[in-house]
UniProtKB/Swiss-Prot annotation:
GO terms for molecular function: tRNA binding; tRNA pseudouridine(55) synthase activity. HAMAP family: Pus10_arch. One of its GO terms (biological process) is tRNA pseudouridine synthesis. It comes from Picrophilus torridus (strain ATCC 700027 / DSM 9790 / JCM 10055 / NBRC 100828 / KAW 2/3). Its EC number is 5.4.99.25. Belongs to the pseudouridine synthase Pus10 family. It is an enzyme of class 5 (isomerase). Substrate binds at Y270, Y339. It catalyses: uridine(54) in tRNA = pseudouridine(54) in tRNA; uridine(55) in tRNA = pseudouridine(55) in tRNA. The active site is at D206 (nucleophile). This is tRNA pseudouridine synthase Pus10. Responsible for synthesis of pseudouridine from uracil-54 and uracil-55 in the psi GC loop of transfer RNAs. Keywords: Isomerase, RNA-binding, tRNA processing.
Amino acid sequence: MDLKELFDLNLCLRCTGRIFAAVDTGLTNEERGARLYFAYKSIYGERDVPESCYLCNGVFKKFDEFFNILMSKLNNYEFNSILVGSTFDENIIEMEKDIQSRFGSKGESIKKEFNREFGKYLSKRLGKPFSKDADLTIEVDALYENVNIIVKPVYIYGVYIKKSRDISQTRWIHKTGESIESIIGNELRSMTGCENYYLHGSGREDVDVMMLGNGREFVIEAAMPKRRYIDLYELQLRVNASGILFIYNLSYSSKATVRRIKSELHEKLYIAEVTGDLNKDIKKACSKFNNLIIEQRTPLRVINHRSDLVRRKKINYINIISIMNGRALLKICAEAGTYIKELVNGDNGRTVPSLSSVYGSQLQVSSLDVVKIYRDD
């Protein structure tokens, strides 16, 4: 190593020591730089070493300033752990890489050191531990000397039962009216002070379909919550007071739970009220669907916002519960993702076969309920 070339870079001791962070472990970069300077001085004599330099611009001496900016933005956010990230001028990053390559590329980046050292500083001042899965992430912009915060969302798992034919699962962008998402989310916002909320459902039912039986799994996400720990039973009581939506089995969860409920596919049991010119032949038509594979092209009613694909779905059975006055009550068990209304009406030939085509007369679903989702509870 050419010590003269090294100190001719005119870096501060911290930035000098960081060039060799992987060589002499057990020391801080500043201590490592001081040792290198001692070696230089013993050969070449005294020289001025800048306290700050063009590489770090004194950023490691600005922790108190960054802390004050952070405190002005915390606004009573509740958190138990922290993580620090940072951004530096790309020119600084490239300059550092170039310098380190000249001396064997055995150092660490300024970002890595800053995140570590400012993280230790914050952990001590805030009394909160460091975590890779932190409640609060602090992002420092070293170039513009600013601090931003990212609050980890709160995820709450539950199961809902919907006893209404007038509410959608999620909010519509350009429409008003209640939804499962808004009924739960507005109460969640009131209790957590979150900026927004998002419902993640394990599948969905149409607006006019009731979700009964053992209910549908969901996760409600509170974005940028001020309060992380709330009484989940109180949330349940508030939502259930609506009289049309009932939630239960609430527990804190995570993004992994969202992925799980989104990926799992479960057979479902439906009760459908069907109208048409009904006679005794409907029983024979229903029997044709025992363990039958049908083909469904994306229904016309949803074609504007879903891909036009043909999907093969298994129908386990269609059983008749009762027939009276031109109405039949059917019990239908089918694979996840089956369009039940189209299974009955045929959707102008886009579902083949349909109950209407097998029966030989047009049938329509006048009401539909999901009464069971076959999952491992």
